Regions:
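Secretory targeting and sorting signals
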Residues: 1-31
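Catalytic loop of the DD-peptidase/beta-lactamase superfamily, centered on the K-T-G motif
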Residues: 2-6, 28-69, 255-376
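Primarily hydrophobic membrane-targeting regions of prokaryotic envelope proteins
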Residues: 44-47, 54, 58-62, 68, ...
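Short active-site loop at a secondary-structure junction
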Residues: 51-54, 77-135, 183-192, 265
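N-terminal, post-signal-peptide region of Sec/Tat-exported proteins
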Residues: 62-82
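Solvent-exposed coil/turn segments that connect beta secondary-structure elements
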Residues: 63, 74, 141-142, 357
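Short, surface-exposed loop or secondary-structure junction motifs
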Residues: 68, 128-326, 330
């Protein structure tokens, strides 16, 4: 899930105030290249100095070598370090998982990318014969984004009233469509979380099973992502995890680690770890999830314009400062910011989570962490 308060979605020195922790190799023989790890650690420490985050955890992969890095703490009281492979809410990185699921159904002949959405969900959307599945996956359908509406505040104090509310996909879409389409379908790009709620409904309409069930059977289980889940209403994060916060107008921090994920649905509800995200990225680029022709469809992009990069089918493609092309996604949900990117050859991968103190994070510092993993 992405909101305007988080800025564009993609997507500190070790001794500073005792906030940062040394890199933690996954195995002694698998330490990542020192220069890259040091560059990433420095940018993570810089993120901590912005004062908007309680902690950061990252997993940097270069070839068959991995390094886990941490900075800050699991809670704002500073008593516990960020878990080395703690669980976290991944926000809109969920969109990559749901898009992969749809593309698998395309490969099975059960969905056509250029079919009108009305073929599968008749009566749900206006212009149902003009809006295609591809447009929805690519945010070019013109569907209004519900997270920009007053009915769905997803940042800081206003969000507290909705924190434990149980939403339905149908209710979210119905409310979003009280606004007209933002533009003529297929003519522009505009990020729409509502569109990805529709994607979840599409998966259920075609398979007879919830998007959570299909993602679990098609992606999570085959890849052995034992610490990844797609909750429906459960408010808990299982296993060790850092805590996320929002900041009230009076300066008080509220722990929002426990929340009802239904507000994010198939566009942002999933939970994972950096280890599992790394495995997922590897599965994506090595053909374990999609046939080459379908992965190629996923990478057909349109310009995002509001930020560097282009958008495919649930996938961001962008160039780093040193010219390396990477693919992946950023994600935000109250309390957490996530990023997961890989080079196309899979040689370098980054999975990273920030447990926030407030929703207004320093996005320049966040972007620097991504860039430093690929351009030391």
């Amino acid at each position: 899930m992405r909101t305007k308060s988080r800025g564009p979605a993609l997507a500190l020195a070790l001794a500073t105030a005792g906030l940062a922790l040394a890199a933690v190799p996954v195995h002694a023989a698998e330490a990542s290249a020192p220069s890259t790890a040091a560059s990433l650690q420095k940018s993570m420490d810089a993120m901590m100095r912005t004062g908007t985050a309680a902690g950061v955890q990252a997993r940097l992969s270069e070839g068959d070598r991995q390094t886990v890095l941490r900075s800050g703490t699991a809670t704002i009281d500073g008593k516990r370090p960020v878990p080395a492979n703690g669980s976290f809410r991944m926000g809109s990185v969920t969109k990559v998982f749901t898009s992969v699921t749809v593309l698998q159904l395309v490969g099975e002949g059960r969905i056509g990318l250029d079919d009108p959405i009305g073929k599968y969900l008749p009566g749900l959307l206006p212009r149902e014969n003009d809006i295609t599945v591809r447009m929805i996956l690519q945010h070019t359908a013109g569907i209004p984004d519900y997270t920009s509406m007053k009915e769905f505040p997803t940042s800081d104090e206003p969000y507290l009233k909705l924190r434990f509310t149980r939403f339905t996909d149908e209710g979210i879409v119905k409310t979003a469509l009280t606004r007209p389409l933002d533009f003529e379908p297929g003519t522009k790009f505009s990020y729409s979380n509502t569109g990805y709620v529709v994607v979840g409904m599409l998966i259920k309409a075609v398979t007879g099973h919830s998007w959570q069930s299909e993602v679990t059977e098609r992606v999570i289980k085959p890849l052995g992502l034992h610490d990844t889940s797609a909750p429906t209403y459960s408010t808990a994060i299982p296993g060790p995890h850092a805590h996320g916060y929002i900041k009230k107008n009076n300066g008080e921090y509220v722990d929002v680690t426990r929340l009802n994920p239904s507000i994010a649905s198939s566009g942002g509800a999933m939970i994972t770890t950096t280890a599992d995200l790394t495995t997922f990225l590897n599965g994506l680029v090595t053909g374990k999830l999609l046939k080459p022709s379908l992965f190629a469809e996923m990478q057909k992009t349109v310009p995002i314009k509001i930020q560097p990069g282009d958008y495919g089918l649930g996938l961001v493609s962008m160039s780093t400062s040193c010219g390396r092309r990477v693919i992946g996604h950023n994600g935000g949900i109250p309390g957490y910011l996530t990023t997961a990117f890989t080079t196309l050859d899979g040689r370098t991968k980054l999975a990273l989570s920030v447990n926030q103190k407030q929703s207004q994070s320093d996005m320049a510092a966040f972007s620097k962490m991504i860039d430093s993993a690929f351009c030391p």
